[in-house]
């Protein structure tokens, strides 16, 4: 622990805490990173005390540098941490880990005069030459030299096959990774694929067919003189009967070069395209947009299936212009047809943005509910016949008595007299049965309406009118008796005190005739 605590002190420790782990990042170095680096040095047989000086850090870098290209992430992190500590001991101003690594590289190059001590990340992949050369065949010292594929390239190819499972992305991925490769390198890539042996067998069959067709189209010219390079056969292009040196000579000879690497790549691309169709049996005609699927997701699926189709570009263009709109859902199709003839993809994506999503469904639902819940439109004739509200309190139209702002009207609203309400108003007309609880006039007999100012001279034609008037007067008297019972009781008591008999009206003839109307029921 003593060595760990004495590695950086004072200003050096403060300087360490100002250096960022990554360019533009928020995290910075702490003392715990030095403790971690000291623990990792024990695994490589290096003493912790080497971190206390600039020379000791340089010895650590000399040991770790050759292992960085193929080392683990912990080894690379240890190398980066030691570079930062070396810069602090050397009083070099750095802001982050990348700056410290660059300073260390320049120092190592200046001391040794070569780039042997530099990490592999800074080494060029191929030396410069007049003609140049694609990786892995490089032109060094006037000769073409073959460099095998790196494990990183092979690992990238295997991951591509395992993750995409021979999707449409495998073909362009193979083209990028096999650029400039010889048939020997391409066979290495194919041999690294462990799974999907059915697809590998399909590719082998395609290679055999293309090799046989090559032999038919390129027959052997005849016996060759000694020392002359022979012409490649189909098996030579496939890398089964040729060496790497012969393949390089065919590719880069000055007269009539044969790009065996590119030819072999085309054969494999044909096989990969068949594998893509086998592993992706969905036809582009079956790609249709779902009722709730966003238009952008539908376009992604459409173009992914179109990418797997091995057809003429003109046919693909027709599919894009016709099927993309034809297989859209009704909502998006209605929007796309409004864009006119041959709209661009950008216009279609912009116009259909949000169509079919939750926002658009919510708007449609809100509009539907608004139509259902909202009041039904009133016909013009019915609106003209509708009468306006009339207030019983102030007599004005346009509002009801409950909404009236005028002072509350006292007394009966019909006759204006106090002491009763409109329901019990004596001025209300009633039939021979009196005022019923229904609040309307009885319909037993028609009531003759006599105009004001006119008195009929002749007796009524119908005798029932005279009888109805008598019933109305009798009903009026009965209402008055019901409304003032206390007054009648007091009058009876006064008559008894005076020794008189209380006056009672005898039953009228009209009420006696009422019994005859109903027979024996009364």
Swiss-Prot record:
Query: Can you summarize the PTM annotation of this record?
Result: Gag-Pol polyprotein: Specific enzymatic cleavages by the viral protease yield mature proteins.
Region spans: Interaction with membrane phosphatidylinositol 4,5-bisphosphate: 73-77
The alphabetized list of GO BP terms reads: viral budding via host ESCRT complex; viral translational frameshifting
Chain positions covered by the region annotation Interaction with host PPIA/CYPA and NUP153: 191-228
Q: Does the keyword Repeat apply?
A: yes
Q: Where is the lipid attached (N-myristoyl glycine)?
A: 2
Q: Where is this site: Cleavage?
A: 135-136, 365-366, 382-383, 431-432, 445-446
Q: Which GO terms describe its cellular component?
A: host cell nucleus; host cell plasma membrane; host multivesicular body; membrane; viral nucleocapsid; virion membrane
Q: Where does motif PTAP/PSAP motif map?
A: 456-459
Q: Where is this motif: Nuclear export signal?
A: 16-22
Q: Where is this region: Interaction with Gp41?
A: 7-31
Basic and acidic residues bias: where?
477-512
Domain description from the entry? Late-budding domains (L domains) are short sequence motifs essential for viral particle budding. They recruit proteins of the host ESCRT machinery (Endosomal Sorting Complex Required for Transport) or ESCRT-associated proteins. p6-gag contains one L domains: a PTAP/PSAP motif, which interacts with the UEV domain of TSG101.
Official protein name in the record: Gag polyprotein
Q: What is the lineage of its organism?
A: Viruses, Riboviria, Pararnavirae, Artverviricota, Revtraviricetes
């Amino acid at each position: 622990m003593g060595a760990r605590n004495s590695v950086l002190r004072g200003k050096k420790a403060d300087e360490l805490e100002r250096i960022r782990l990554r360019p533009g990042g928020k995290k910075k170095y702490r003392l715990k990173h030095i403790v971690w680096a000291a623990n990792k040095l024990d695994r490589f047989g290096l003493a912790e005390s080497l971190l206390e000086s600039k020379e000791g850090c340089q010895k650590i870098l000399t040991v770790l540098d050759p292992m960085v290209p193929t080392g683990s992430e912990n080894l690379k992190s240890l190398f980066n941490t030691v570079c930062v500590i070396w810069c602090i001991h050397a009083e070099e101003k750095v802001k982050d880990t990348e700056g410290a690594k660059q300073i260390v590289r320049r120092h190592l190059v200046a001391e040794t005069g070569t780039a042997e001590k530099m990490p592999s990340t800074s080494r060029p992949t191929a030396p410069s030459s007049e003609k140049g050369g694609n990786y892995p065949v490089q032109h060094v010292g006037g000769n073409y030299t073959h460099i095998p594929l790196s494990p990183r390239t092979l690992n990238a190819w295997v991951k591509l096959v395992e993750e995409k499972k021979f999707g449409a992305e495998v073909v362009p991925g193979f083209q990028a990774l096999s650029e400039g490769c010889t048939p020997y390198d391409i066979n290495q890539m194919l041999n690294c694929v462990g799974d999907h042996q059915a697809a590998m067998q399909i590719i082998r069959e395609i290679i055999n067919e293309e090799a046989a067709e090559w032999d038919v189209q390129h027959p052997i010219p005849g016996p060759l003189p000694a020392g002359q390079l022979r012409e490649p056969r189909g098996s030579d292009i496939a890398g089964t009967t040729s060496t790497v040196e012969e393949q390089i000579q065919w590719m880069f000879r000055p007269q009539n070069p044969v790009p065996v690497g590119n030819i072999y790549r085309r054969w494999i691309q044909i096989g990969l395209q068949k594998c893509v169709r086998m592993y992706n049996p969905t036809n582009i005609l079956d790609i249709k947009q779902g009722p709730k699927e966003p238009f952008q997701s539908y376009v992604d699926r459409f173009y992914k299936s179109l990418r797997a189709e091995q057809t003429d570009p003109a046919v693909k263009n027709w599919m894009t212009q016709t099927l993309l709109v034809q297989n859209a859902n009704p909502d998006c199709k209605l929007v796309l047809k409004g864009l006119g003839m041959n709209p661009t993809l950008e216009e279609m994506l912009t116009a259909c943005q949000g169509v079919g999503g939750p926002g658009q469904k919510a708007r449609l639902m809100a509009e539907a509910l608004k139509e259902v819940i909202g009041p039904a439109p009133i016909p013009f004739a019915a609106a003209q016949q509708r009468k306006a509200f009339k207030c019983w309190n102030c007599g004005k139209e346009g509002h009801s008595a409950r909404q009236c702002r005028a002072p509350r009207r006292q007394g009966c609203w019909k006759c204006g007299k106090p002491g009763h309400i409109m329901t019990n108003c004596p001025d209300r007309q009633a039939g021979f049965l009196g005022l019923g609880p229904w609040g309307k006039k009885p319909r037993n007999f028609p009531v003759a309406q006599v105009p004001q100012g006119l008195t009929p001279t002749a007796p009524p034609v119908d005798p029932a009118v005279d009888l109805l008037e008598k019933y109305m007067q009798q009903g009026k008297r009965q209402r008055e008796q019901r409304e003032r019972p206390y007054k009648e009781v007091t009058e009876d008591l006064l008559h008894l005190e005076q020794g008189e008999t209380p006056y009672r009206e005898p039953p009228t003839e009209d009420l006696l005739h009422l019994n005859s109307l109903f027979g024996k029921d009364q």
